[in-house]
Amino acid sequence: MSAGKRGALIIFEGCDRSGKTTQSRLLVELLKSKGIPTLPMNFPERSSSIGQVINSYLTNSKDLPDEVIHLMFSANRWEHINQVKEKLLEGTTLVVDRYSFSGVAYSAAKGLDFDWCYAPERGLIKPDAVFYLRAPPNDLTHRGQYGKERYEKVEFQGRVAEVFNRICSKEGSYFHQFDARQSVEDLHAQIASITEELLPKVATRPLDTLS
């Protein structure tokens, strides 16, 4: 497995508590163990001034109109675009827990227009692969700390899953769907296999943008 001339942008997406954080951590550990320069990231990135407002919203200590928080989530990704581009071109693979697709899915699930939600994401760097972990929201409620944050409600997560399905159809071949109910080990093995094939393919491929 080799990172080649540039790194890959790999995204983990899915409903809350679907296993994204665990699987992204395992993939980072695997790639690093093979000597591949790899950096974990997650969105929202809560340490910036924008990220701190988002964190206050998610932890229910601040209320904002749906349109405003959607644009803040997008701005949080935009404020890191130069870092993302720089790392990829250096040859570092980025493994990212949530990206633009979560922003669209969660806001559209609240009733905002799908195309309006997508608009501010256009121009961000297009992922080389998205690993979408699917599971019925009812099957995720037993997982640790479910319900602690604003969006962790089964009915709402069901609507989020419906929008994710629409996004998968729209974005096509670089979306890889997995049953999140399988064992951590089996899921990791499948993701590792796809990643092993992916890295040399994208090494000389120019960066693309979401459109």
Swiss-Prot record:
Keyword check for Lipoprotein: no
GO biological process terms on file: dTDP biosynthetic process; dTTP biosynthetic process; dUDP biosynthetic process
Membrane-traversing stretches: none
InterPro entries recorded: P-loop_NTPase (IPR027417), Thymidylate_kin-like_dom (IPR039430), Thymidylate_kin_CS (IPR018095), Thymidylate_kinase (IPR018094)
Cellular component GO terms, alphabetical: cytoplasm; mitochondrial matrix; mitochondrion; nucleus
HAMAP family associated with the record: Thymidylate_kinase (MF_00165)
Subunit text: Homodimer.
Protein name as annotated: Thymidylate kinase
Origin species: Drosophila melanogaster (Fruit fly)
